[in-house]
Amino acid sequence: YCDFSKVFIKNQPVDSYLEHLLEEFQSYDIQKLRTLYIGGGTPTALSASQLEVLLKGLTKNLDLSVLEELTIEANPGDLDADKIAVLKNSAVNRVSLGVQTFDDKMLKKIGRSHLEKDIYENIDRLKLAGFDNISIDLIYALPGQTMDQVKENVAKAIGLDIPHMSLYSLILENHTVFMNRMRRGKLPLPKEELEAEMFEYIIAELERAGFEHYEISNFSKPGFESRHNLMYWDNAEYYGIGAGASGYVDGVRYKNHGPIRHYLSAVEEGNARITEEHLSQKEQMEEEMFLGLRKKSGVSMIRFEKKFGRSFEGLYGEIVRDLVQQGLMQIDGDRVRMTKRGLFLGDTVAERFILE
């Protein structure tokens, strides 16, 4: 279900990879960052000493007084006491755990190596080490999953007493085991109506527990929104570092070489990128809408006009009025945003903002 760049760590040149990744990072001469996010991939698969090399290398030239958030992703099965000690002694101030589900049978089915007990152990250890900004990822609409199982997962997640959760419905990516099984008719996924019911239940329960549904898939207690992801949904620019990473800098969307050995050679030659795409103003405006409408707060029409020097009304007025009439969008002052129904139909609504 996950199409990130991934490799088995065994027999991989891990130390050499870290060295090259840090070389790529340093080539940008970055001194000030508001957010840094390590993961999409699992950095805690590294040994404690390798993790320390990575964290020190990334932060040694950074002005930490302006770094608001440093998130690291972790697998519940990987976080031992040594690795937590490394995190504690670094600039990391937010940890995101790939829980996915609390059901041991389902974890095995989706190829995860951790168990439910590891989730509780890891969160207790992180809290004891002083981490209060903890997030978990959960997946719903898993193969054969029932509404009762979703209810149980949500109750257990709320019981963890953490300030942030990301909940994603299972999306099948090409070239993954799940997609191959579905094509062979061997994957009993919940029907769309049940998936919608699951999503509505999740929103209602988490809001009742004091979480704000601030983006299609994300819920937080006040003040604990993911700053890194908000920057991304605001269509701000970001560097992507490492094998298979994507970035968006100076109006250029780029992607790095994926296979590790190709990436190592590319860094040695002085350019890790395999593709670069210069976005036109039309494409930038479309992205502003696609990404911004994922947020509960939506898109500011004033900010849009300042950024692009174009009339929002002239470009999108008619489309917005039509979506408002259908109950999928609403206008609040200078902002346009999705209704709850619109959020569930996210991509279908966003497609209306493709400019001819």
Predicted regions and their residues:
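Local cysteine-cluster metal-coordination motifs and their immediate loop/turn environment
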Residues: 1-4
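C-terminal scaffold of the Radical SAM
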Residues: 7-28, 32-310
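Short amphipathic alpha-helical interaction segments
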Residues: 310-324
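A short, conserved structural fragment
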Residues: 324-334
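Minor-groove-contacting beta-hairpin "wing" of winged helix-turn-helix DNA-binding domains
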Residues: 335-339
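Short, amphipathic alpha-helical interaction segments positioned at domain boundaries
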Residues: 341-356
